Regions:
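Short glycine-/aliphatic-rich beta-strand segments at the starts of folded cytosolic domains
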Residues: 1-11
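Short amphipathic alpha-helix segments
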Residues: 9-25
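Short amphipathic alpha-helices in soluble, non-transmembrane regions
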Residues: 18-22, 54-62
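Conserved short beta-strand edge segments in small beta-sheet-based binding/regulatory domains
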Residues: 32-33, 62-69
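Short Gly/Ser/Thr- and Asp/Glu-enriched loop/turn motifs at secondary-structure junctions
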Residues: 35-39
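A generic structural motif
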Residues: 40-44
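Helix N-cap motif at beta-to-alpha junctions
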Residues: 46-51
């Protein structure tokens, strides 16, 4: 399963921190940010994960995160 999210994270350091946190929360998932894209893309790939968990982790820190349609 691959899910793509739109975020407002524009800082590389923050993106790295969130990637580490998401990998801990979602074992076995690959997490990658593309901050060059205008939507500040977050891509999560794994066999089983709940997209709402990704949104929760990001939004709990005050950032926006939504599934990109």
């Amino acid at each position: 399963m691959i899910e793509v999210f739109k975020t407002n994270i524009s800082n590389e350091k923050l993106a790295r921190q969130f990637a580490i946190q998401l990998r801990n929360e979602l074992p076995g998932c690959r997490v990658k940010f593309d901050l060059q894209d205008c939507d500040k893309i977050l891509k999560v790939e794994g066999s089983q994960f709940i997209p709402e968990k990704v949104i929760e982790v990001i939004s709990m820190s005050g950032f926006e995160c939504e599934v990109l349609e």
